[in-house]
Amino acid sequence: QDAAKGEALFKQCQTCHRADKNMVGPALAGVVGRKAGTAPGFSYSPLNHAAGEAGLVWSQENVVEYLADPNAFLKKFLTDKGQADKATGSTKMTFKLANEQQRKDVAAYLATLK
């Protein structure tokens, strides 16, 4: 995991995200360690809210999996928690990052944002 490479890759994310302010996507400073769906002032999808209420806390590992397929990750999380009935709809995030090493690098960078 290379946070410097992740910072460079994060430029792709800046269409929707910033570290310090909500845009189309939530502010990402402090995301690692934060409960899903809880960035102050951001209007999340019901799917994101449900995952947070079911106990999803963003770890680097969760971020790596999420970036591969956000909707599939959240739906699997809810289903694994016995809440398949809440695993409906979709997250606002449609971007997917196929390369696992790149996902790890981005997650490492996000972990540096406080």
Swiss-Prot record:
Protein origin, superkingdom = Bacteria
Modified residues annotated as Pyrrolidone carboxylic acid in this record: 1
Q: Which SUPFAM superfamilies match?
A: Cytochrome c
Q: Name one GO biological process term.
A: photosynthesis
A single Gene Ontology molecular function, please? heme binding
GO CC, alphabetical: periplasmic space
Which keywords does the record carry?
A: Electron transport, Heme, Iron, Metal-binding, Periplasm, Photosynthesis, Pyrrolidone carboxylic acid, Transport
Q: Could you state what the record's PTM comment says about this protein?
A: Binds 1 heme c group covalently per subunit.
The residues that the entry says bind heme c are 13, 16-17, 93
- Pfam families (UniProt xref): Cytochrom_C (PF00034)
Compartment list = Periplasm
- What family does the database annotate? Belongs to the cytochrome c family.
Q: What does this protein do?
A: Cytochrome c2 is found mainly in purple, non-sulfur, photosynthetic bacteria where it functions as the electron donor to the oxidized bacteriochlorophyll in the photophosphorylation pathway. However, it may also have a role in the respiratory chain and is found in some non-photosynthetic bacteria.
Q: Please give the name of this protein.
A: Cytochrome c2
